[in-house]
A protein has these predicted regions:
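Predominantly a Rossmann-like dinucleotide-binding segment in NAD(P)-dependent oxidoreductases
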Residues: 71, 76, 190-196, 200-272
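ADP-ribose/adenylate-binding Rossmann-like module
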Residues: 161-173
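Rossmann-like NAD(P) dinucleotide-binding subdomain of oxidoreductase/dehydrogenase enzymes
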Residues: 175-177
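A generic structural signal for short
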Residues: 68, 141-142, 172, 198, ...
Length: 272
């Protein structure tokens, strides 16, 4: 092997260095909630390279924002708490889900953990709940329903001029993808903010590692493989009285028509 070629040992050594560098990324990336206040929050972007976001610890204070949550299960609840932790002046004002028990679980969590109360008349159930949440005077929505439903929900939010946090995956089939892309162009034309839940793309250690790679730390990358080894996320036993549809939706991660299966639903993080 020529000296300029990258050996396995050199590669492992370099990736260990990158891992160590990633641990100090929070100190390297500017924050809009602390420090000397000189940061202009300019995204880190190089000519010809793809967008690399700046990752502040907390959002800049501004006017109060009213937020609606569409899909109040585990991911919707988690994203809602994440949002409240990440910024001041956030008020969750509307909740929507096919199932009332999901809404009540999130209401209780908001009440107990964040001292926020969502009024009865602002809680909506059924397959049209997303429309009622979006029409309830919110500034932005968290869209965390099963992936198959997200294109239609995002399309409606965009039509109504509402900003969106859209969980990944954004779609599970070509039709859904085309719906998303058409709505995205409309959102851009309207000046709406749209963020997707691709966590690797927004994780400080990964961002810092990418910066080191782009700087040439491990040399030219000519190829690679992406792996994700994992067992079952979870499984919902069918309960007496559940219809086929209710069982599918409550157990959505295990049904390809709703989740897109492992590559689309989970492995998309690492592919991204």
């Amino acid at each position: 092997m020529k000296e300029k070629d990258l050996s396995r040992r050199k590669f492992l050594t370099s990736t260990a260095i990158i891992g160590a560098a990633g641990m100090v990324a929070p100190a390297l990336l500017s924050s809009c909630s602390g420090g000397n206040g000189n940061s202009k929050l300019t995204p880190l972007k190089q000519e010809g390279e793809y967008y690399v976001p700046e990752l502040p610890d907390k959002a800049i204070d501004g006017r109060e924002l009213k937020v609606g949550v569409i899909g109040c299960g585990g991911r919707g609840s988690g994203a809602t708490i994440n949002l409240l932790d990440a910024a001041n002046g956030i008020k969750v004002t509307a909740l929507g889900d096919v199932f009332a028990d999901r809404i009540e679980d999130l209401r209780a969590r908001l009440r107990n953990d964040k001292q926020q109360e969502v009024a009865d008349e602002m809680c909506f159930t059924g397959f049209d709940a997303y429309q009622k949440v979006i029409d309830a005077g919110v500034d932005m929505v968290i869209i965390a329903t099963p992936p198959a439903f997200r294109p239609v929900h995002f399309q409606y939010a965009t039509e109504k001029g509402v900003h969106s946090f859209l969980e990944k995956p954004i779609a599970v089939d070509p039709k859904g993808y085309r719906t998303i892309m058409a709505a995205a162009k409309q959102a851009q034309a309207k000046g709406l903010s749209v963020v997707t839940g691709t966590q690797r793309h927004h994780e400080r250690r990964y961002v810092e590692a990418n910066k080191q790679i782009q700087a040439g730390l491990i040399g030219e990358i000519t190829g690679g493989n992406v792996y994700w080894n994992q067992g079952m996320l979870w499984y919902k036993e069918r309960q007496p009285g559940w219809s086929d549809m209710e069982w599918n939706i409550r157990d959505w991660v295990n049904w390809t028509w709703l989740s897109g299966d492992h590559i689309v639903e989970q492995h998309v993080h690492n592919i991204d």
